[in-house]
Structure formats: C-alpha cells, structure tokens
Amino acid sequence: MAAYKRLKQCDMNLIIQGMEVENRDLRELAKLAGANDIERITGQAFRLRNASRRELVPDYCAEAELDFAFVEPMVQLKEFGLVAMDMDSTLLAIESIDEIADIQGVKAQVAEITQRTMRGEIVFAESLRQRTALLQGVDQEALQFVYDNRVRLSPGAEKMLQRMKSAGLKTMVISGGFNFFTDRIKSRLDLDYAHANTLDVENGKLTGKVLGEIIGAHGKAEVLNKVREELGLKREQIIAIGDGANDLNMMEAAGVSIAYHAKPVVQAKATYAINHVGLDGILNLFE
C-alpha cells in the first residue's frame, strides 16, 4: 500500500495538536522541524508541511504539552477498512473492572493489579484471574449500576467513530474486560464487532471466575486477524488503538497503531501517540 512505503523525512508533515496551541509554539516547531508552511486543520490542530527534521520536536512538545506526529501527506481514512479499539481507558474513560471492584470495596487492590498489567509487569490472563477472584459474590445487578452511572466515553469518541464510519471503515471493540459492557457499548455506538471475556454468574452473583478462554494480548490479535481476513483486508488497512501492554499484539497486527493516553511501553512501539487531546485527535492524522 502506497501509504506505508519508506519515506524520506522531507516528505513528511508534522501534525501538532493540544488543548491550547500557541502561535509561538507553531513558529518554533516549524523552525525546529524545517517545515515550510503552517495550516490549521481544526481549532487546536495544525499541519506543518514538509518537515525535514525530527530530533528536537519530541522534547519541545513534551515541555509544551502538545501532541505531535510525523505523517505521510495525503493519506486518507478511506484507504483503511477497519478500526479496532481497546475498551477500558481507550474507548471508555474508565476501567470497568475497577468500578465493579469499588462496589465490592476492593478497588484499591484491583486497580493496583490493573496498573501493573498495563505496564506489562503481570501476564494479562493471570492478572484477570486475580482481579476477577476479588469480585466473587458481587451481585450481577452491580454491573448494570456501573454501566448506568460510571461508564463514560473518552472525549471525542463519538466524533471519531462517526467520521470513520462515514469513510467506510468497519468498527470493532476488542477488550480484555467483560462482554456485559462491550455488548452495550456496541449497541450504543452502533459498532460492527465486539469481543470480550464472559463473567461466570450463579444465582445472580459473580463466582469470581471467567468462562472460556481468556481474551488477553494474544487473543486480541487473533480476533483482529480473524475479522481482517473475513473482511478481505490487508494488515496495512487496519487501524488499532490501545493504551496498555495487553494491546501491543493487537497493535502490531495493524498497519497504523495509535497509543491513546498510554503507558510508556505502548507509546514506544506505536506508530503515533495521543497524550493530550481526545480520540477525535486521531482524525487529524489523516487528510
């Protein structure tokens, strides 16, 4: 696919976006990057054309709290066929299992395991078993309470999905969390696919176990590849978005991977990283 040939640096555009982008930042970044033109994409997103130098841009943007991305000119969303998204702390602004744990009074313990898992310190399947075991005895109705009262979409999620659907992309959420939430998110956002783990329930209460094979890092990639093949798409036509170490395999199976407010290990391996703006900031990476 032409969008992913190896390019000379002078062929790249530099995308700058943030909560508040100052003119002086744009002028300085254009100088640092050797860009010859600055154009506004949206209110706080800008394209610096023909950027030929990268070395000083990351440190400047980190200090100024700006997102940056070196992108190939003229790559359009319609060149892609599928966007695959993690759910917790990506499509959603919460960790759903942590919120269930809060009702059980074990949020601190579960959240600690969650964070260690996202940093890659614990194998996902084992961490999910540990966290789910702490939920034993929770009333099944607590899941609906969490969905109704605590689930929040990440900023820009609906705008991003609307634009991607308009461009012809299929949409999929793949989660190491629970299908109670992914099924409802799929319906709410009119997604094409949703895959997640299933909690075991007996007599209206969680048993502390997960049914079937756990969807973790490898499982996410397997699901993505299966759907990609069913759709007749190439790897280069896939966009994957995630935040934790268990998303890395899924992201590696995509042509473009985006680390969204992600752990350092994920940012280091992703095609692009978004740290300051919402999910709709992803749209500004394409023309």
Residue ranges and their predicted role:
Residues G81-V83, Q115, I238:
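Residue-level marker of motif borders
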Residues A2-R6, A142-V256, Y260-E287:
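C-terminal cap/substrate-recognition subdomain and adjoining C-terminal extension
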Residues G81-S96, N246, M251:
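Asp-based phosphoryl-transfer active-site loop
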Residues M1-M85:
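Non-catalytic pre-domain segments flanking phosphatase-related domains
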Residues L26, V57, I97, T182, ...:
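Generic structural marker for isolated residues within well-ordered, non-membrane alpha-helices
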Residues G34-R49, F70, M74-K78, T90-L199, ...:
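Alpha-helical substrate-recognition element adjacent to the catalytic core
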